[in-house]
Amino acid sequence: NNNAMFNLSYGLFVLTSQLNGKDNGCIVNTVTQVTVSPNQIAVAVNKQNLTHDMIKVSGVFNVSILSEKSKFATYKHWGMQSGTDTDKLEAITYKRSANGLVYIEDEANAFISAKVVNKIDLGTHTLFIAEVTDCEVISEDPSVTYAYYHKNIKEVPQAKTEAKKGFICVICGYIYEG
């Protein structure tokens, strides 16, 4: 029963990068510290995300660790639209870290800046192993977990009277109707 995978404990994050002067970001749920010395993290990113391609070329990224105060609109903004179709920095509040990349502060409790030192091809995703170059605590608010998101933040889709073809993403709840 693959539902057992939902019992793994992990957070939700805004992953940002930049390439050729264009900033972008997406929601990811797989960021973890893998070593303390050197301080390294790993992040798995879907190859279909523009942010993936930016990180693959630029070799740098930021992770904003979302807190329990985060709103569904944040997940919708960063995770339910493509950076190829929209400017994700338009009409949002953000800051830049020492590496020049964007991080969000309002709904995050910390950010981490990192430089890629290794890449592992996982088929649909790439696992980026990266050395932490900067990190900062923003607030003491608890980090949002995937379980907390589903119980307290995620909006339940309204029932439709007309059936449409599509799918619902099991990770973020995004509904694609084609």
Regions found by a protein language model. Give the residues of each.
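Basic, polyanion-binding surface patches
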Residues: N1-K164
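Short cysteine-rich clusters marking metal-coordination/redox-active sites
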Residues: C169-C172
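Cys/His-rich metal-chelating microdomains
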Residues: I175-G178
